[in-house]
Amino acid sequence: MTQTFDPGAFLATCSGRPGVYRMFDAEATLLYVGKAKNLKKRLASYFRKTGHAPKTGALVSRIAQIETTITGNETEALLLEQTLIKEWRPPYNILLRDDKSYPYVFLSDNAFPRLSIHRGTKKAKGRYFGPYPSAGAIRESLSLLQKTFQVRQCEDSYFKNRTRPCLQYQIKRCKGPCVGLVEPEVYAEDVRHSVMFLEGRSNALSDELNASMEKAAMALDFERAAELRDQVALLRRVQDQQSMDGGTGDVDVVAAFVNPGGACVHLISVRGGRVLGSKNFFPQVGIEEEVGEVMSAFLAQYFLGGIDRELPGEVIVNVINDDFPAFVDAVEELRGVEMVISHRVRGTRARWQQMAVTNAEQALTARLANRQHVASRFEALAKVLGLEDPPMRLECYDISHSSGEATVASCVVFGPEGPIKSDYRRFNIEGVTAGDDYAAMHQALTRRYSRIKAGEGKLPDVLLVDGGKGQMSMARDVLNELQVPELILLGVAKGTTRKAGFETLYLNDSAHEFTLPGDSPALHLIQQIRDEAHRFAITGHRARRGKTRRTSTLEGVAGVGPTRRRDLLKHFGGLQELSRASIDEIAKAPGISKKLAESIYANLHSE
């Protein structure tokens, strides 16, 4: 593709039918995918001499080839466009950076049903409620249900092996069905009430609970009446916090907001008239910077991209676009759902719409302000380090362990826009003396920079080490051993008071020692990155330590490998319950012989 692209010659043979077009650069890299009702007319608009946005002009200047695919109609073009965008993720397209499944509340189908969070395919027998826009929203609902109706949320394996009620019973978050502390019909009633709440029938539920409360009071069952009173009070509190008069339909409210710094789409999920929660999306804005184009791209990628996602019957938007009819047809063709897109709404729906618009504007404003704040800190750090330009990539390392147990090293990465979490890494440290932080850091840096030297990852401009002269010298030794190209090495040691704002800094070698004022933006950036590395290391260490403590007592038993160990713990609901089991009870577990049960029992009860 070395020849110059000739738009006139291309357009002379281009079809005027609906279809999809793909733009490539001279290296055959796909730059952009688009759709059109009339391919020739749409593509001709790119080659006008005036009226282009800067990003469109940049795209056109790189075009070396255009390929087209004619489709039967606009709907087919939309579906093909989304398939290609999802597969290739072209740099000039609006891209939705959210491809994970959304959580549901799952109610199991057994004698004493369990409420839990579920993601992925719906294989288990039971009922699913949702989807919820975030894990936080679903946890909030489950917490409320646990307080109000005390339906169990424990794993079935844990439930089946209880011999006495757990802590959840003591704090009134469960009625103890595992040990027979609640009658099946009473528990079933609590489950029915939970279902009413999850279906959005809170008003009917409140009326029913009020009637039951009055009935209990008339029967002088004041304990039951007080319990029902508390349930009604909790429900009223939720109703006061949410817009509840929107009917019983399922609605998603979507608002898009665009300014020169980026775009935000705010989505509110309403199921059965109840607001389940909301979520912000910050799509990568391509050449289409108009708010209507952002909305159109979001709807197509969000609703057509997740095949396992339940679709609402109505989507309320704050802007309209000519692509909406094709989108609605595509939803019906691909998913078999009749969807209505509403723009002019009244009453509660109008309040939801305005709420989404306000949240989108505020979220983008806050994001851009934070980005500007971080960028100013990077500029301040550049001055401190004597650099002409701010560094583009900072890495910081930290070590976490408990008296040498389960040592974990962390690596966090920051850029001018904030943390780059996709590049975070943890290292489980092995084969070093317990508590030897220098050896642990040496191993982590060696593993990290050996991979970078091999082409896996990017070198930072600044390497930040949480430690004093010893850690600095060790880091310099690793870089020299691996012949890593010159980069800035910055050590951060706590001052004599060990308080924030009094850190001692070491630049490149331990001889260059200095401090910064407590109000220095550069120091604030260093503290932010160091604290993030510390947090990331601690969470990794705690997870590793917990896993080790759960399984280490079984690791020495011959015949109990990782799979059997996992199955055994799942069968008994944890190590504590397994420790309480007799030899005969252990032998009843799948795949465990009497002889192996004796070995397990002896191992668990050895001093």
Curated annotation (Swiss-Prot):
Record NCBIfam families: PRK00558.1-5, uvrC
Occurrences of domain UVR (ranges): 203-238
Pfam families: GIY-YIG, HHH_5, UVR, UvrC_RNaseH, UvrC_RNaseH_dom
Biological-process GO terms, alphabetical: nucleotide-excision repair; SOS response
One annotated Gene Ontology cellular component of this protein: cytoplasm
UniProt key word Nucleotide-binding: no
Function in brief: The UvrABC repair system catalyzes the recognition and processing of DNA lesions. UvrC both incises the 5' and 3' sides of the lesion. The N-terminal half is responsible for the 3' incision and the C-terminal half is responsible for the 5' incision.
InterPro entries found in the cross-reference section: GIY-YIG_endonuc, GIY-YIG_endonuc_sf, GIY-YIG_UvrC_Cho, Hlx-hairpin-Hlx_DNA-bd_motif, RuvA_2-like, UVR_dom, UVR_dom_sf, UvrABC_protein_C
Protein name, entry field: UvrABC system protein C
Entry annotated with the keyword Ligase: no
Entry GO MF terms: DNA binding; excinuclease ABC activity
Domain of life: Bacteria
Occurrences of domain GIY-YIG (ranges): 16-94
Key words, A-Z: Cytoplasm, DNA damage, DNA excision, DNA repair, Excision nuclease, SOS response
CDD domains: GIY-YIG_UvrC_Cho
Gene3D superfamilies per the UniProt record, alphabetical: 5' to 3' exonuclease, C-terminal subdomain, GIY-YIG endonuclease, UVR domain, UvrC, RNAse H endonuclease domain
Subunit structure: Interacts with UvrB in an incision complex.
Subcellular location(s) per record: Cytoplasm
Gene (UniProt): uvrC
Family: Belongs to the UvrC family.
